[in-house]
UniProtKB/Swiss-Prot annotation:
The keyword Phosphoprotein does not apply. This is Transcription elongation factor SPT5. GO terms for biological process: mRNA processing; regulation of DNA-templated transcription elongation; regulation of transcription by RNA polymerase II; transcription elongation by RNA polymerase II. It comes from Yarrowia lipolytica (strain CLIB 122 / E 150). Coiled coil: none annotated. Residues 880-891, 905-916 have a biased composition (Low complexity). The gene is SPT5. Its main location: nucleus. Keywords: mRNA processing, Nucleus, Transcription. Residues 1-17, 25-39, 970-980 have a biased composition (Basic and acidic residues).
Amino acid sequence: MSDREESGSPEPRSKIEEDLESDEEVKTIKSEEVDKTQDNVEDEDDEEEEEEEEEEEEEDDDEEDVRQRKKPRRERRNQFLDVEAEVDEDEEDLEEDEDGLIGEDGFVAEPDADEPDASDDRFHREMDRRREAIAEEDAERLADEYREKYGRSTANKYRGDSGVIPQHLLLPSVNEPSIWGIRCKPGKEKELVRQCLRKKLSLQKSRNPLEIMSVFQRDTFTGYIYMEARNQQAVTVALKGLVNVYPQNMILVPIKEYVDLLRATKSAETELVPGAYVRLKRGKYGGDLAIVENLSENGLEVRLKLVPRLDYGRNAEAGIDGKRKRVARIPPPRLFSEQEASQYDPRNLQKRGPNAYVYAGDEYIGGFLYKDFKITLVNAENVAPKLEELTRFNSEETDGIDLASLAQSLRKSAAAVQFQGGDVVEVSEGEQTGVQGTVISTHGDIVTVEATTAPLVGKRIDLPSRSLRKKFAIGDHVRVISGNFLDDTGLIVGLEDDSVTLLSDLNKKEVTVFAKDLKKVSDIGGSHQVGDYELHDFVQLDALHVGCIVKVERDSLKVLDQEGTVRSVTPSSITMKLTRNMEGLATDSNGSEIKIGDTVRETVGEGRQGAVLHIYKNTLFLSSRSLGVFVAKAFKVNTIVAKGARTQSNSQATGPDLTKMNPAVYNARPGQMAPPVMPKQGGFDRLKGKHVAIGPGSQHKGCKGIVKETTDDIARVELHAPCKVVNVLKHQLRIYDDYKKTYLSYMEFATPRGMRSGGGRPGGPPGPGGPGSGGQTPSWGGGGKTPSWGAGGKTPSWGSKTPSWGGAKTSSWGSRTPAANAGGAQTPAWGAMGNKTPSWGASESRTPAWGGAKTPAWGAAGAGSKTPAFGVARTPSWKSSSAGTYGGSSSRNKGWEDLGSGNSAPTPGYAAATPGEMMGAPTPGAAHHPWEDSAPTPAAYNDARTPGVYDPRGSGPAQAETPAAWSTDDAPRYDDSPTP
């Protein structure tokens, strides 16, 4: 350029240069655009091909640089440019003049003779071949190649959503903030968390923000909230000014417990909405059904509507301090009664409006209780309300019950639905809604169903039980498998969503139940039992009526009595159930015995025929397949078929077993002695009016009451609680004894006092049970000439080898002197005149009387006898100065002169030389003084002249015992005499 400027023509050359330079810039820009296009195409190819092309291009560039060192890069660009098309036609004249200039500039690429002709389009052909090969490749193969080539390069790239972090790196460490547990008032945990959140937000942009990271509470840890902070001071500042929290004793949670404390658990809480059914967890209304009326603003309390349980203060007793004590018995649920409240507890009753009252601080509207409960006391899961519970909320009409909402709440409980194999079901929710099928099997909450409708006909699918409901059609015969109408059967007459109306086979009434409680059956059945009573049981209705149960209903029984009348009674009104051994016996018109199970036919009237179910006196309860149960008189029937292979001829020949007519013998168990019959005085039974307790063997065991009426073996007892009259066998009673302050068995009560174990021995002192025995022979309390109950007769009995009292040839009762009651003895008995031994009252005798004795006794006045008399012994005994012979004075009217002890005989007794019974009295005792209760002759009971028994009841004058064994004073006793 500098040479041209020096030649003297700068302007034309400058213009040409400018034009050439502008053209060169345009072409350079276009070539760059082409290069960019080529680069874009090459970028679309794989990286390996791109590297190969770059290597080839570098080799070509090296060759071109050698050939054209003046323009190394333009050679590559000129291959893709049409140079001739870019030159302006106006400049054709200048081309010849300026060939050298153009050649020097190198704008036009001159073809090199050494370069081959195909070098210009080599790259074009290569590109075309590659594009054709790519187009011909299979798309699936190409995708595999791309995945293989580029998958390795992209696998190492980090993606935030696909990164996997080891679990141990998520565990808390010592570098994490600490968690502090703070005690608070139970039920205020959530409220305190909200207060801390508001305080944190309000102080966030202030000069002193709270330095806590988080605040939370757990439902499983009541009474605590937890704060996350770096130090304890930050927690104290955050809690400053809050109520219902106690920051004095904070708990630092250990690091190893962070995981359990912060583990997220799925909440099982059910959202409470007005109208939902719930149950209370505990308290007086624990387990009762309630309806949600409203929720409080803080969400901690809920207002419920429920049926109240009130006794209106009748079962509460006032204590010493005037406060009422609550009893443990919970009243039954009943609607509020304003009349009862005003009658029994008017002080706590206030009227707020029409049919609205406030009683004892609670609000009652329309008879229902409206009360606020803490939400923690409410259970909204598995409520499963029953229809009988819902009828309490609408006692007037059942149309008010929302069965649809009730069924919706029941679906939430999987345990409320029971599916069995063969049930026809329908899918009620999910993608298969409306599909019907048959249940094949069940496994927990999963039910396997074989579809019977399109588009899944024949396929088996597993579905959760909560998404299924049973499907029935009108006319199906079903059975109730749960609920209040359990085991009832009937015909479906109406369908409405999940509720089914059926006509019961038992009472021909329509009942409404849920479809989940039904099962399709073909048989007809029903409940045959209510409480303890079943169909055809024989029961006692009252004192005069018995009957047979002929029909069992839901809450009542149909009973046919002995008069042929059918009564409708409740189980609680039945007195008792009669057993087979309590039934009577009867004979037919031919005199044949009738037994239970025999088949008989009426001889008069309609001539009905049936089998004997029960027998009551002369009334038969018969059962016929076509007539049911009916009543007939025994003397108006004939036996057709006898039970137990008995024949009518044998029955007529032998007649009835009269031994079974006695209930005491017929009802006795084998090996058991029949209870004794009570002795009656003037037709009055002493058992009447007694306080008794019912013992084992009766269904009323443990109950107490008063005996009102009695028969030979049955007593009618009026119970204290419950207040009713029942029939009880006498031997099952325990009679209260006012004397002993204890209960006696019927056997003890019926046994006379003298014969009881505590009555004393015959002729001895009275025991604790009653008066002693003694008196005239024979007597119920003493012995006789025949050996009595305590003696062994001629064989020596207990206590003596010498024949004992009551039948010995020697004098009885251990006395050598003939004593009273010594009948049959060779020694003359009492009253025999002319005996060798002087009789009593004899003033003169060969044998010295009591006035003298060979062995002088202490204080004796010459009393003596070969046979020691009364009061005289070989060894001087005490008071030997007394008369030796019973009544041995010169005057018969004068008794003993000694006024000492009158009930004890001074003859040696307890250790007498003559063998005798233990503590046997040798001589009939007499009184010390001539009273009316003293007589030398043994007499009967209550006879003043004969030593008898002592009656503690004071029914007559006191009688001296024979022999007397004790004294109530301090006089010497009979058993105190020394051994001779």
